[in-house]
From Swiss-Prot:
Belongs to the LpxK family. GO terms for biological process: lipid A biosynthetic process; lipopolysaccharide core region biosynthetic process. It comes from Hamiltonella defensa subsp. Acyrthosiphon pisum (strain 5AT). InterPro entries: LpxK (IPR003758), P-loop_NTPase (IPR027417). It is an enzyme of class 2 (transferase). Pfam families: LpxK. ATP binds at T55, V56, G57, G58, N59, G60, K61, T62. The lineage of its organism: Bacteria, Pseudomonadati, Pseudomonadota, Gammaproteobacteria, Enterobacterales. NCBIfam families: lpxK (TIGR00682). This is Tetraacyldisaccharide 4'-kinase. The gene is lpxK.
Length: 328
């Protein structure tokens, strides 16, 4: 229902507009309090690159964070990542991730980032606490704040916004009448805009998600995803249809799709009935990190990586690297 209101042609959003006006006023007052000096944002001793959204839901931030980390490491920088750790509940914050950290503690996205990159990752409701914890243990040159665009308590040196190139801004209304966390005019003040799929407009950088081979959750075996038989596709992400469309474009024989809520908590009893032993259950990497403890031999996940035009990507990386040299 909410997707039809935000991204369809339903006029039910009109009923929610008064609440959106109130939300807009509150967010404007928060930003104003920092700009006027009534509230003081915390400045990290090393550069902060924020990767965030203007809209609610899965726009593809995690693959971009992973790409940034990998590319900046190749340039010789020591990089760390901080996050709110949404959906995770730890007994103590800040939490620095290790190979034993579970998604239930840190959230699924920080765990994926840590497992894919191996760089220091910390989560805390207050990002400055996560940053301080990392800097006590690691000599870092630069930090990436995952989903921190609206966290104005943290000063940032570079803002990167990710937009779903297919759905873009929906009806362009603020929450709850629409998907917007902030007004579209916020784009005028950011440093880079990345479009996930679709067609890039002026000043936007086009990103494509490139799938690799499917990975078995139990054995680690890899094979082309189109070789999986009788596939039941499931996704608990912000935009599950993107995952299903990717599988279809790869020629996967999809028998059924199953959508779960974003950041869904999974159990064996929930997933076991979805696919028979003669079928393949295929999921996203973000879902997979929450299912490995009870995975079955016919469960697979499909990792994806961000891919950018060479010239634009090098310009983006050079801008971020220059920040570090200037501040450090």
């Amino acid at each position: 229902m909410i997707d039809r209101i935000w991204f369809g042609h339903s006029r039910l959003y009109l009923l929610l507009l008064p609440f959106s006006w109130l939300y807009g006023l509150i967010t404007w007052l928060i930003r104003l309090s920092y700009r006027s000096g009534l509230r003081v944002a915390w400045r990290s001793p090393i550069p902060i690159v924020v990767v965030g959204n203007l809209t609610v839901g899965g726009n593809g931030k995690t693959p971009i964070v992973i790409w940034l980390v990998e590319q900046l490491k190749k340039r010789g920088l020591q990089v760390g990542v901080v996050s709110r750790g949404y959906s995770g509940k730890s007994g103590k914050y800040p939490l620095i991730l290790s190979h034993h950290t579970q998604p239930e503690e840190a959230g699924d996205e920080p765990v994926v980032i840590f497992q894919r990159t191996g760089v220091p990752v910390a989560v805390a409701p207050k990002r400055k606490e996560a940053i301080r914890a990392l800097l006590k243990k690691h000599p870092l040159d630069l930090l990436i704040a995952d989903d921190g665009l609206q966290h104005y308590a943290l000063k940032r040196d570079f803002e990167l916004v990710v937009i779903d190139g297919i759905r873009r801004f929906g009806n362009a209304c603020l929450l709850p009448a629409g998907p917007m966390r902030e007004n579209i005019t916020r784009l005028h003040s950011v440093d880079a805009i990345i479009i996930n799929g679709g067609e890039a407009q002026k000043e936007e950088i086009l990103m494509q998600l490139r799938p690799s081979q499917a990975v078995n959750l139990v054995t680690g075996e890899k094979k082309p995803v189109e070789e999986l038989i009788s596939v039941i596709a499931m996704a608990g992400i912000g935009h599950p249809d993107r995952f299903f469309m990717m599988l279809a474009q790869l020629g996967v024989n999809i028998i059924k799709t199953q959508i779960f809520s974003d950041h869904q908590h999974y159990t064996l009893s929930t997933l076991l009935p979805l696919a028979k032993k003669t079928q393949s259950l295929c999921m996203t990497e973000k879902d997979a990190v929450k299912c490995k403890a009870f995975a079955q031999p016919n469960w697979w996940y499909l990792p994806v990586s961000a891919d950018f035009p060479f010239v634009q990507s090098q310009k983006l990386l050079a801008s971020i690297e220059a920040l570090c040299h200037r501040i450090c």
